[in-house]
Amino acid sequence: LHASYRRQRQMCIRDRAADIFHLKVDIAFGGMDQRKAHMYMRDVADRNKWTKATCIHTPMISGLKGRRGGRMEVFDHKMSKSDPANAIILHDSAKSLSKKLRKAYLDQNDADSPVYEIARHIIIPTLGELKVTPKPEFGEPTTWSDVDKLAKAVIEGEVHPFDLKMGVAEGLSSVLAPLRSHFDDNPQKLQKMLEITGK
């Protein structure tokens, strides 16, 4: 089984490299899980004196369910549209984001928990800060531009994990608002995209 899995992974890497050559891609963009395929592509290009695509790799965001459920490959817990409940979909409504983040896995001591990752890689770089607003009887709103300090505040009880999740949901909703507006104004484009992705 292990050898079969390894062969399958190798085939997948070769297929992705072949796609880059076939499509004459100038810039190959993907998560860090695509690095092996991209480096293989560049090695093949060197050996054959073919044009090499420039490769850009982004951080991986964990699925909302986190890494629970036993031993996993390093990228097997990544967010993927194949499980919509485990992922943020670009046209998710504010209500859907709130529902998903409410259920999202959060290990207060793990900086790689998906809630922290979304704050670190999406919300704070885009909006400049993350706002956490508890119910009035539980305190005043706070803003955060440093995820490590935010995580420390959660561990020490200054920020409640639920309030953090709802703050992340609201921040994501703000980040995705222009996309939602675009698809609201152009529903045929959303329909076309859904037909292509099969979702």
Positions of PLM-derived features:
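Single conserved hydrophobic/aromatic residue that forms the stacking wall/gate
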Residues: 1-9, 13
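Short, flexible active-site loop motifs that bind/organize anionic cofactors or intermediates
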Residues: 2, 27, 87
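Short glycine- and Lys/Arg-enriched binding-loop motifs that mark or flank ligand-binding interfaces
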Residues: 5, 26-27, 72
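Conserved nucleotide- and phosphate/pyrophosphate-binding catalytic cores
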Residues: 17, 23, 35-199
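Glycine-rich ThDP/TPP pyrophosphate-binding loop and its adjacent helix/strand module
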Residues: 29-35
